[in-house]
Amino acid sequence: IRDRDKIDYIIECARLAPSAVNYQPWHFMVVVSEEQKQNLRQCYNREWFVRAPVYIVVCADKSIAWVRKSDNKNHADIDAAIATEHICLAAAEIGLGSCWVCNFDPELFKANFGLSSERYPVAIVSLGYIQEQPDHFTTRKDKDEIVTFL
């Protein structure tokens, strides 16, 4: 993805995502350099993943996230997930494909990228142009399986 404006648009959409009490406990790492891509790929080394031209890593910071008083639930992960979905939706809107990845080694990531103890990676979103003939297709559950009207 050579068009920096597309990446800027995607990040702007993520930046504007809602968060609990508007605390915005996230940080976005846009990985474009070959050296940093290699560091990232050590954390999740799959053939399809290593071909992506750009990655956005969504990190959360529990120290600045809202915490629900009734049960001490920290909302950093939830807020980061909302921002991650904004990334995926923005990418689709401008004709890019994305894949939200959580099956990576977060400790190796923190070591490779020197994250502070409070900041941690929640998701890696690979971005690129969609193949004309995709390698695989996913199925979705029928609406009747997942929706209850009350």
Predicted regions and their residues:
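Glycine/small-residue-rich phosphate/adenosyl-binding loop
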Residues: 6, 11-12, 16-83
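Small-aliphatic-rich amphipathic alpha-helix that forms the alpha element of a beta-alpha
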Residues: 14-15, 56, 71-112
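Residue-level "edge-of-site" marker
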Residues: 27, 104-106, 123
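Short, electropositive alpha-helical surface patch
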Residues: 109-122
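C-terminal helix-cap and adjacent tail motif
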Residues: 124-150
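Short secondary-structure boundary segments
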Residues: 60, 103, 129
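A short beta-loop-alpha structural element at the N-terminal edge
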Residues: 1-5
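Structural motif
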Residues: 53-55, 98, 120-122
